[in-house]
Design a protein with these regions (language model features):
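Residues that define the transmembrane beta-barrel architecture of outer-membrane proteins
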Residues: 37-41, 78-82, 117-123, 173-177, ...
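Outer-membrane beta-barrel architecture
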Residues: 2, 44-46, 85-87, 124-128, ...
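Detector for outer-membrane/organellar transmembrane beta-barrel domains
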Residues: 89-207, 212-213
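Surface-exposed loop and membrane-interface regions of Gram-negative outer-membrane beta-barrel proteins
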Residues: 1-4, 17-31, 68-72, 107-115, ...
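Repeated loop/turn-to-beta-strand initiation elements of outer-membrane beta-barrel proteins
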Residues: 6-10, 51-57, 93-97, 134-137, ...
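Transmembrane beta-strands of outer-membrane beta-barrel pores
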Residues: 7, 12-16, 59-65, 90, ...
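Outer membrane beta-barrel
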Residues: 1-65, 78, 83, 87-91, ...
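Outer-membrane beta-barrel "beta-signal"
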Residues: 225-227, 250-263
Length: 263
């Protein structure tokens, strides 16, 4: 929950680093593997420059998720994440957005008995382009170091910081990136489809095991029907492939179905 007043947002809301209006509609709750879809406590200010431009700056409390190894320990995070973005909205309702984030992630080096900070950072670009009155293209790409918490597929599993290869108590912020693209087509006022492809990648594993996540691909297609003003039903096919650093991989296919009624 959050409250808004004169451009300020206080409470738990979607991260300022992301762009939820560029995320494609899926039945799958997780959505694209590279999506930036996280809600966190924040204080945000949004400034409407004019009818076309707006910008936001925030302080957000994010739970760092890192792997300590044998010679490091987790500590309480003292510095909030600082994301910002700027958006341009076109006359036809299309928009593009760019954003950046700065993180200071604290941990304890047990060998040196000293608290340390690693700086994480990230940049992103996203948008929704209305190609015709019934077809839109949605996209997003991001790159950074120490921003695993923000990337859907690797959020919360210990990749914001990882032990260095020598595991001497130092942690590093590995590079990571992702992208997705999706077409959404309205067949008529009540029937629509989305086709999505997404890719997410971790660039280094430090001293983590060989079965650590390296990259994954995600693809899906659906057909949704708004059978009333408040009701939606649909069916969806999703395919996923994960590759590890040791070259092991796995594929999975799934059929999702949904009936939703909004009160």
């Amino acid at each position: 929950a959050f409250v808004q007043f004169k451009g300020f947002t206080l409470g738990q809301a979607w991260s300022t680093f992301g762009d939820m209006t560029a995320v494609p509609t899926t039945i799958d709750e997780e959505g694209p593997s590279s999506g930036i879809e996280i809600r966190q406590p924040m204080l945000r200010y949004t400034y409407h420059i004019n009818d076309r431009w707006q910008s936001s700056l925030a302080l957000e409390y994010a739970k760092a998720s890192y792997t300590t190894g044998k010679n490091a320990e987790s500590i309480r995070q003292k510095v909030p994440d600082i994301p910002l973005n700027i958006r341009y909205t076109m006359k036809n309702g299309s928009h593009v957005q760019v954003g950046a984030i700065l993180r200071n992630i604290g941990y304890k080096n047990v060998v040196k008995d000293k608290d340390k900070i690693r700086t994480g950072w990230g940049v992103m670009g996203s948008g929704k382009l209305n190609i015709t009155s019934s077809t839109s293209f949605l996209f997003q790409a991001e790159y950074g170091k120490g921003i695993a918490n923000y990337i859907q597929d690797i959020s919360g599993i210990g990749y914001d910081l990882i032990p260095t290869a020598d595991d001497n108590g130092n942690l590093k912020a590995p590079g990571m990136w992702g992208l997705f693209g999706a077409f959404q087509h309205n067949w008529n006022p009540k029937l629509y489809s989305t086709i999505t492809y997404s890719y997410a990648r971790l660039e280094a594993r430090g001293s983590l095991e060989g079965d650590t996540y390296k990259y994954a691909q995600y693809a899906g297609a659906n057909l949704l029907w708004n059978f009333t003003e408040f009701g939606t039903t649909g069916i969806e096919y999703v395919f996923g492939r994960r590759n590890n650093f040791n070259h092991d991989y796995g594929n999975a296919s799934r059929i999702n179905a949904m009936i939703q009624y909004r009160f």
